Amino acid sequence: MISGCMRDTEVTKTDRLEERSPARWAIAVFAHNEEQDIVNALESVRNSASIAQVHAYVLINGCTDRTESVVENYAQRNEWVTPISIELGDKANAWNLFVYQVAGDYDAYFFADGDVEIEPHALNALYEELMGSPGANAAAAVPCSGRHRDQMTTYVTESRLILGNLYALRREFIQRVRKAGTRIPVGMIGDDGIITSLVKWDLDPTGEFKDERVAPCIHGKFKYRSLSPWSLSDLRTYWRRRVRYSLRHYQHELLVPILRQGGIRAMPKSTTDLYIAQKQCIAGLRPRHGLDSFFDRIALREIRASAGAR
């Protein structure tokens, strides 16, 4: 099994991976400083489908802890796992690399965060839901833990939103993504919002936005460790997460009008390009009400600094 080493958005000639493993499915596992959770995440992949059926590519991006060595040690004992080391710590960039330079041709593509534990048979359930929904481009999993699990489940089942923690994309959809050259802007926070939109648009932002293109899967479940209010480390994580949620909100608000007007080819390469293109709109952005307001102000300050629109 090959361990690939990637620098930001490029792969050297000697780093290119095999076109396809014998497995039918590929799963991208995004890992950024996940040394404590990544083994449990991979073990849960093992229990959620036959390891003869799925190949896991662990996208180790921008890690400053022991994640890389932990994954490499695990992969030495498990041929169905390939570590991919990426210098840039960015999920959107890692998503692009997986789709275009890592995974070959598979029957289905799964995406999971490196801190989630996938419930037994969840990948099978997602695949069956996807195959049983001919009009769907994606199948969305639901959480079975966390204080907000009921609310998040409602988002999936009623609003047909994709949660970035775990989802599946149809083979034909990935093929069309590649043919169109569609990439997520580097720096985009979270893949769930933009992937949900691309799936519902069927890669045509100027066309119809159809909920039925996302198939909710109530039997495809995952869980994750809840943050503790008594842990200083978890409080820091909570702070960063809330700022990132605010960034994600405004990034989506800025991106959608560009795509609706210019189509998929208008997709910016990075959030820096997005901010520059929407510099005039950024000046008019305002914080929301409630607790979000505090974190929105931090996010807006960062966005305006990147756009040079202080």
Q: How would you describe each model-predicted region?
A:
Residues 24-26, 55:
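Cell-envelope/extracellular polymer assembly enzymes that use nucleotide-activated donors
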Residues 34-48:
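Short, well-formed alpha-helical segments that are part of the catalytic scaffolds
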Residues 37-40, 65-74:
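Acidic helix N-cap motif at the loop->helix transition within catalytic regions
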Residues 44, 57-69, 88, 116:
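A conserved acidic beta->alpha catalytic loop
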Residues 96-108:
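Active-site nucleotide-sugar/metal-binding loop of Leloir-type enzymes
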Residues 105-117:
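Short beta-strand-to-loop acidic/aromatic patch adjacent to the donor-nucleotide binding site
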Residues 117-153:
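Conserved donor NDP-sugar-binding/catalytic core segment of glycosyltransferases
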Residues 229-310:
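Terminal low-complexity segments of carbohydrate-biosynthetic enzymes
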